[in-house]
Amino acid sequence: MRRRLTALFLYAAAMAFVESAVVVYLRALYPRRGFTAVSPLIYRIEVLREAATILMLLAVAYLAFETLTLRVATFFWIFAVWDVSYYVFLKLLLGWPASLGTYDVFFLIPVPWVGPVWLPLVLSLAVFIAASVAFTRLPSHARHEVASASN
């Protein structure tokens, strides 16, 4: 199980780097104008990019295990790793956010979600802990799947 979660962690962190790199590019293209300054085409592409990111996380969670319980726990676990890593990479690459109270656009689907950076970090930490606990409290058939996945 540890090897599999390590691989999933690395995947989620790598996805976060890709996402943060996109933000670096967008900020270079649209400096100090905010997200509302982007063209309708760029906005639509961003919505599709977000949807594609979620689909990639879902696909990896689906491929990682056989049972629905493990797939759901895995999706939330890698989502949390991805989300926290995204902000870590933004801080390393851009020195942003200036503080945990800095406002950000979290998602564009179905509508823009805006709030302080601390909010997704706290929620992701809670989701990470809940998913980690779920991994340790599996029914016997799921424990067997996890044990066989480690081999």
Q: What function would you assign to each model-found segment?
A:
Residues 37-59, 108-129:
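Membrane-interface loop-to-helix entry segments
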Residues 61-68, 129-139:
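Structural signal for the C-terminal ends of transmembrane alpha-helices
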Residues 74-94:
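Active-site beta-strand/loop microenvironment that shapes enzyme catalytic pockets
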Residues 56-64, 89-96:
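Membrane-helix exit/interface motif
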